[in-house]
Amino acid sequence: MKKKTILLAIIPALAFLLLSCTNYSDDNKQETDKPKENEPQDITPDDTPNDDSNNDGNTTPVDNNPVDNNPKEDKLNPMDEPYIGRQYYLNHIGDIYSAWGTYRGKGITIAVIDAGFNPNHEDFYYADGTSKVSDKSASFTTTSSGTTTSVGVDKVVNMSESHGTFCAGVAAAAINGKGVVGIAPEATLLLLKTDLKPKSIAKAFKYAADNGAKVVTISIGSYYTYEGDLVNDGSDLGTVFDEPVKYCYDRNIPVISAGGNGGQSQPTEFTFPGCVDNVIGVGGLAANSSTNIWEGSSYNSSPQYQFIDVFAPADMMFGCCHYDGKLYDGGWNGTSFASPIVAGLAALYFEKNPNNTSIQFENNLYNSCRALASQNGVQSNQLGHGRVDVTKLLNLTSSGSVTARFKSDWSDCYAYVWNSVTGTHQNSWPGTKLSKNNGVFSVNVDSSTYDSIIFTQSNSGPKTPDLLIASFINGNVYDLTSPISEQGMDFKVGVYH
């Protein structure tokens, strides 16, 4: 919907990596070298020790939460989680504590695509002892013979590293009095383990869409420059990922991806699949900040390459793990952990708005963000729509006044408000007739039901006009210039509010 990949050069090797860094305890400390070009970057410990690294469950957390949750009597209190005071990032995404009083992701499934998990982590069980991990969880492996799928919770186990477990916990760790709380603590987890090969990841996307996921988060990717790339078998990554991502999007399943840890040292690099059309790319905020970007986060290096859409906390993260006998750890950083935050917000959104489309979620997400100011040589227009805000996201109005303008060579044109899922329209068919060259379409839109405005030609053969569309909703102006290249295609623009 917003990103275009440019594929111009062949790169002989493809390496997908986990988009995070970690701080382990001193006795595990290793040196971290910059990965060689086109080689995978392992999750290696950072040289900097931190106070959160030796969490054996005996440390009393400091309550850093300024907001009283006041949950309903029939709900468990997230403030009773032993380590919620170390989840500082919860204070920098809007008032999540109040949101939990009503919405916790109940009935929503979050698919997490990664390199493996500990599906039996104690925070993946509810207080009554039932697991929040879907029995449809699966693993995907690609060889020269093709990609195979193995279904079952036991198939997703990877105890050699904690990246996937940490990401899943950020999104949806349960409220059970054990440790931490996820953004959507009552959401179901569909855990999808891959061997980090592109075709395995692509198959995981489609599997998620076909097996109950309402949102997909992925925190693995591959860095490349704007010259483009090809995978080893000669097919480009755009081809590998475009179709399965669109498969999700067309079924109203948003795909959310870590935007990359390029930072200012790699300003011209982006990541697959985060740069693919219809993927929401997430950049990272600095520790304990609502306004400063994390120094390691990728950002949009120029106006024509807008791959990072929103920002969420990504630094000094505390969450679920499994190594050295530990179940929780702190000091982790990376856009890997910003992506599941946004996925958790999506779960809350769809619990409130179960009939809304992926277009509506994306538009509501962007319009609810808080703009980020220019900083450290990075301009505000390089920082996407800004920092996510759960309060605004869940309290946007469900209707708004829309005015759209167009210029074209059409002798006649009709405009109508449309629901892309049900195929229904708000105003009577064929819609409102617009005059040539300066058509104006104004209507009050119930955006809880309708997600698009359609401009279509009638009573004459198909043409290929250039349309200049501006959509005004609740005082916001959106420049939506788009030439039509396919004959007979309707021009569709998402409804913002």
For the regions a language model picked out, list residue spans one by one.
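Sec-dependent bacterial lipoprotein signal peptides
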Residues: 1-19
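Bacterial Sec-dependent N-terminal signal peptides
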Residues: 17-78, 195
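Substrate-binding/access-modulating region of protease and related hydrolase catalytic domains
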Residues: 24, 29, 100, 104-106, ...
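Active-site core segment of subtilase-fold serine proteases
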Residues: 68-188, 203-236, 288, 324-326, ...
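Structural recognition of the beta-strand scaffold that forms the well-ordered cores
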Residues: 109-113, 169, 181-182, 188-193, ...
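Extracellular S/T/G-rich loop segment that most often corresponds to the catalytic His/Ser-adjacent loop
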Residues: 114, 271-351, 355
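Hydrolase catalytic cores
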Residues: 168-171, 190-195, 214-215, 314-383, ...
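Aromatic-rich carbohydrate-binding modules that target alpha-glucans
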Residues: 409-447, 458-469
